Amino acid sequence: MDWLQSLLWDPSSVAHIVFLYAFVVAAGVYLGKIKIFGVSLGVTFVLFAGILMGHFGFTADTHILHFIREFGLILFVFCIGLQVGPSFFSSFKKGGMTLNLLAVGIVVLNIAVALGLYYLWNGRVELPMMVGILYGAVTNTPGLGAANEALNQLSYNGPQIALGYACAYPLGVVGIIGSIIAIRYIFRVNMTKEEESLKTQSGDAHHKPHMMSLEVRNESISGKTLIEIKEFLGRNFVCSRIRHEGHVSIPNHETIFNMGDQLFIVCSEEDAPAITVFIGKEVELDWEKQDLPMVSRRILVTKPEINGKTLGSMHFRSMYGVNVTRVNRSGMDLFADPNLILQVGDRVMVVGQQDAVERVAGVLGNQLKRLDTPNIVTIFVGIFLGILLGSLPIAFPGMPTPLKLGLAGGPLVVAILIGRFGHKLHLVTYTTMSANLMLREIGIVLFLASVGIDAGANFVQTVVEGDGLLYVGCGFLITVIPLLIIGAIARLYYKVNYFTLMGLIAGSNTDPPALAYANQVTSSDAPAVGYSTVYPLSMFLRILTGQMILLAMM
């Protein structure tokens, strides 16, 4: 039975470590599906499964636990960054400043509540321990590490602040998710209406394509060419088909418009009214029943060399005699603007003769199998650069310890940048949704299992004996009070969408489990966008403020 003894109890055995993680993750994910009052904790339950196993002595080497924890977190935040990168900067313009101000409010209130409790207990809880509780309450491990480095600079010899962190962390996770749920019921959030509101907000009228059939009624454009009309009108649109005297053809820049001609126009919703008034009037016409010597087809961009090229630079009309009317990216239709940058994974709607469309398909790739091959190089190049950025010390005057973004903040920032600008470096950033979700889920469960196993050994003893319960209570107040206050302000004053607010709360607390819960509630990317919009600034402030408190008050 030596093999069983080694499998169950030998912390240096690879088989034991894999066995332990497999059990903790499987049990946690399974139990996380159980709903209490209609609410389940999802993968967050992996944390508690890890604490339980750690309490009964099932553990692994500390260095291995820390490696798996950090690697899991890196995978999670990097995949989040890749997913939201294309929309990160635009979301910042459309309300990101408001979200970041609200996140700063949460950080400031967390500190205010922590210092208030420190003075309330009048020395019973030492300041370093309260900082440890603060970081557990906001589930921020890099901040805890930075605080420990500051204490080393101050030659601190007191109790390990990680105990306060361990006591506050579990209820910190529960408190953050609980606050999200509480806000939903306090403000009677209608999830269906929030989804519809989100779709309305995300439908950017400048990019969303609008299709209509128009009849030429303006005598001033009769006899003018398509290019002349475009230049005079000053609006961007695509005329993919024209019906003249009962015959349908594909127009080019030299096609002349005549009174009574019927046109199929694709433009942005923003430009549609002006184009309609200028050309004539909108009519009902079934183009499928006309003598149409052409086909319309969605073609998939799969060739890496197309990645990063603008639609106009491809010269589809002049070289192949086809028109591109719209581009579908990640389920959203975009107007075929000549300046639109094509990316691998885009679906391009092409209208033209059968043989011409086939030639365009060959140019773009249109091979679904290519998209099934993961772009491993981009992922690991991004992680490499992210760790490099996260390890870069940022010195501030008067601060003995340089600040760092850490192993979570660095990869997230780099992933966002790669997701947005990777095409300029000829990096293919497309990843199938299933592959992205798989990597994210693996990352988050490894992170949670590691934290739980590591904290489980001393957790019960710390809670039952000494001031453990006090630490738990303080941490819970630090977690909940700021979230409820800022949540109320966000909903009542700023009218923030509930799903975006979920991401804001998770990101301001740098809490991946809360984001994982939010992603289970909705199929939209709003929580992930909200999370990544506030995460970089929140992470920076979390790391900075703990060190500043200790250096200023000790």
Swiss-Prot record:
Keywords: Cell membrane, Membrane, Repeat, Transmembrane, Transmembrane helix, Transport. Residues 199-281, 282-366 form the RCK C-terminal domain. One of its GO terms (cellular component) is plasma membrane. Gene3D superfamilies: Regulator of K+ conductance, C-terminal domain. The chain crosses the membrane at residues 13-31, 36-58, 73-92, 99-121, 161-183, 376-395, 405-422, 442-464, 468-490. SUPFAM superfamilies: TrkA C-terminal domain-like. InterPro entries: AAE_transporter, RCK_C, RCK_C_sf, YidE_YbjL. It comes from Bacteroides thetaiotaomicron (strain ATCC 29148 / DSM 2079 / JCM 5827 / CCUG 10774 / NCTC 10582 / VPI-5482 / E50). GO terms for biological process: potassium ion transport. It is a multi-pass membrane protein. GO terms for molecular function: monoatomic cation transmembrane transporter activity. Pfam families: Asp-Al_Ex, TrkA_C. This is Uncharacterized transporter BT_2092. It comes from the Bacteria. It is found in: Cell membrane. Its main location: membrane. Belongs to the AAE transporter (TC 2.A.81) family.
